[in-house]
């Protein structure tokens, strides 16, 4: 985990334009002993190649591979510009994080930062923060409320089971491992009978022991009988705030529209999408899967190429890292795409809904095959 010092954070700065802002940041990196004087040329050259604007008012200026020899030690300098700095194409940066890193050390840092900054509320707080301490707490995720835990780690699919107790125990264990519940919750949800929602779907929860909002799902390989009723899938909810309500609403919509059977046959990524994305409930969604071959995965430059390809089309497009959390992200947001933590060899599933969905998926596949600007 990268550690950020308050000495590396500069609140309330001003710059007339992007170049001036980058020169200020480069000077701070040099002053801190992170880079030699020539690194600024690489930072400016990088902007000519691809804008380092991530979205949500955040930019991450950094050098090119040609100036890696100018890096003395890995580090960052964070500049806050409350009045904003135009970063091109109508984009305004309020926080610029200058990165100095040799080899590929910056990729882990970038993924860490984008995971925090992809939260829209955090980005807004970064604009209005007034002290280095407050900015540091936001960037390190110390002030970030915990997001709903519902991903591959809280799902157990294709379980050999002939009773609900097996599914109850699996879900309780998953939630306990995630730090979402305590022993009282585990005991309650294992001992009490779940509620039958119909169509093979069952639900349980507990008023006690909720430490963090999370949802666990377990599914039997084959449906079984519980007192004359079909049982195949159990959803267990830990509720510490209102976040699980949206999941329960989507579950309710599936049941009302007699589409809950999708949950019984879907793979992990599709099941997550059904419970977390409204688009997944429609019938006119197309999907395609591609493998990322870029040596360093989807960092800022190939990520930008991917997002720019997606923005050429009108369809709503989401992307899911099948080898990551499995949760879908908005394909038009560079911040959210980079936060997926895509590495070489990871499988991405794209879903598209709209009049040009088929063309969009083909263009995405072609762009990935061509190396997203880094060569095939």
Swiss-Prot record:
The keyword Chloroplast is annotated on this UniProt entry: no
Active site annotation, chain numbering: 62 (tele-phosphohistidine intermediate), 299 (pros-phosphohistidine intermediate)
Region named M domain: 156-284
A GO term from the CC aspect: plasma membrane
Molecular-function GO term, any one: protein-phosphocysteine-sugar phosphotransferase activity
Keywords, ordered alphabetically: Cytoplasm, Kinase, Phosphoprotein, Phosphotransferase system, Sugar transport, Transferase, Transport
Keyword Ribonucleoprotein recorded: no
Main location, first listed in the record: cytoplasm
Cell compartment(s), UniProt: Cytoplasm
Domain PTS EIIA type-2 residue range list: 2-142
PROSITE patterns hit by this protein: PTS_EIIA_TYPE_2 (PS51094), PTS_EIIA_TYPE_2_HIS (PS00372), PTS_HPR_DOM (PS51350), PTS_HPR_HIS (PS00369), PTS_HPR_SER (PS00589)
Positions carrying Phosphohistidine: 62, 299
Tree of life domain: Bacteria
Induction: Induced by fructose and repressed by FruR.
Residue span, HPr domain: 285-375
A Pfam family recorded for this sequence: PTS_EIIA_2
UniProt comment concerning the protein's domains: The PTS EIIA type-2 domain is phosphorylated by phospho-HPr on a histidyl residue. Then, it transfers the phosphoryl group to the PTS EIIB type-2 domain. In contrast to classical PTS systems, the fructose-specific PTS has no requirement for HPr; FruB combines a IIA domain with a HPr domain.
Functional summary from the UniProt entry: The phosphoenolpyruvate-dependent sugar phosphotransferase system (sugar PTS), a major carbohydrate active transport system, catalyzes the phosphorylation of incoming sugar substrates concomitantly with their translocation across the cell membrane. The enzyme II FruAB PTS system is involved in fructose transport.
Protein name: Multiphosphoryl transfer protein
Gene name as annotated: fruB
